[in-house]
């Protein structure tokens, strides 16, 4: 029997445990949402892809299912998607859109009951009324229907300081024609901010078109204007832009030196669908702004250091569990190796006996 065959039962146990954990994690959401697609649904995707006409009105129906033994409350929202700092399409309610956005999804969808009560082992239909714009538009409007489950009384009592929130989202895409729009980008404001307790420079890269732009390559450099010394560099290979959105391209002061006041120059390059966009723009960091950002970064770093110290103080149990798990793995490997050696010794002994018998 090979070593792999001996290990397979152990691997199977871990796979079963992982599968059980995944099922448990999905069940812990406490609810599910099932969209009902109308006749003007354009595709077989799992989200709403609706072809609409000017002034059209229709109902969108989503069934919320509660499979648990407890009554739950779910709040419903509709909003336009945006582009996250990570370079992905953000289906949460960040409200960061470009000035070219013609319509907010929240202005087109009315929710009669934004808070729905679903009894245990029951389901309820949520009805959202869609009213299309009076004027025609090219491209797409992309939004999200978010369903947020409120924590139950038991969850509130057992959560302590940390409260988990469970949400599910269904994308909604609205269009009036199949006209394809060319890609285009523009540069917006450049500011100094705080990102993950670090001073940073944020360049707003705009997608002013009513279309998605997936897999954009972006490269950014920041120079001191007078010395032309490069102080920041960032390269991203796969940026996804939501329609009519702003991507906050962020360069973080990872060394922790802070920002100096002065005049700087940003060079931004974008590549998409065989085209290249290049931007060169000066900006200033005022002394008061640099002082404020650096001070906030120091304060947040100190707070995080305190939290890490507290975590280290209560982590012996975690380390003990990790150590125990590692010990189990080591013992299993040792046993397998010993068993293999024993099998080899037995096989060698059998071969010797057979050889002697032949003589």
Segments and roles (model prediction):
Residues 70-97, 125, 131-179, 257-303:
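Terminal connector regions
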Residues 65-70, 81, 135, 206-212:
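Short solvent-exposed strand-capping/beta-turn motif centered on an Asx-Ser/Thr pair
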Residues 327-339:
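Alpha-helical transmembrane segments
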Residues 178-315:
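Membrane-proximal extracellular "stem/stalk" segments
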Residues 96-136, 223-259:
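Intrinsically disordered, low-complexity Pro/Gly/Ser/Thr-rich segments with frequent PxxP/GP/PP motifs
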Residues 44, 55-61, 123-126, 138-144, ...:
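Short, solvent-exposed loop/turn segments enriched in Ser/Thr/Gly
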Residues 34-68, 72, 115, 184-196:
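Beta-sheet-dominated interaction scaffolds and their linkers
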Residues 341-359:
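Cytoplasmic C-terminal tails of single-pass
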């Amino acid at each position: 029997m090979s070593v792999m065959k001996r290990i397979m039962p152990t691997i199977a146990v871990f796979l079963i445990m992982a599968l059980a954990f995944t099922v448990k994690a999905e069940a812990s959401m406490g609810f599910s949402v099932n969209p009902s697609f109308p006749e003007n649904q354009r595709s077989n995707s799992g989200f709403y892809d609706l072809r609409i006409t000017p002034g059209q009105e229709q109902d969108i129906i989503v069934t919320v299912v509660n499979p648990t033994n407890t009554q739950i409350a779910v709040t419903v929202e509709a909003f336009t998607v945006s582009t996250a700092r990570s370079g992905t399409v953000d289906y949460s309610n960040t409200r960061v859109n470009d000035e070219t956005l013609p319509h907010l999804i929240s202005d087109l969808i009315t929710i009669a009951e934004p808070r729905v009560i679903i009894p245990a082992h029951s389901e309820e239909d949520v009805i959202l009324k869609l009213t299309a714009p009076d004027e025609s538009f090219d491209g797409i409007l992309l939004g999200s229907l978010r369903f947020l489950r409120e924590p139950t009384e038991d969850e509130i009592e057992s959560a302590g300081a940390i409260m988990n929130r469970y949400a599910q989202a269904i994308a909604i895409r609205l269009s009036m024609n199949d006209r394809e729009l060319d890609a285009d980008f523009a540069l917006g404001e450049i500011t100094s901010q705080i990102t993950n307790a670090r001073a940073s420079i944020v360049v707003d890269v705009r997608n002013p078109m009513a279309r998605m732009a997936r897999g954009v390559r972006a490269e950014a450099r920041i120079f001191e204007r007078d010395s032309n010394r490069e102080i920041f560099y960032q390269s991203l290979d796969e940026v996804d832009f939501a329609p009519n959105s702003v991507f906050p391209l962020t360069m973080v002061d990872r060394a922790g030196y802070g920002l100096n006041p002065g005049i700087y120059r940003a060079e931004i390059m974008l590549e998409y669908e065989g085209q290249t966009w290049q931007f060169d723009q000066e900006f200033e960091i005022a002394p008061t702004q640099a002082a404020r950002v650096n001070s906030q970064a120091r304060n947040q770093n100190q707070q995080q250091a305190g939290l890490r110290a507290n975590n280290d103080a209560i982590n012996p149990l975690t380390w003990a569990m990790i150590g125990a798990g590692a010990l189990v793995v080591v013992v299993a490997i040792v046993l397998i190796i010993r068993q293999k050696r024993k099998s080899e010794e037995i096989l060698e002994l059998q071969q010797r006996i057979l050889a002697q018998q032949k003589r």
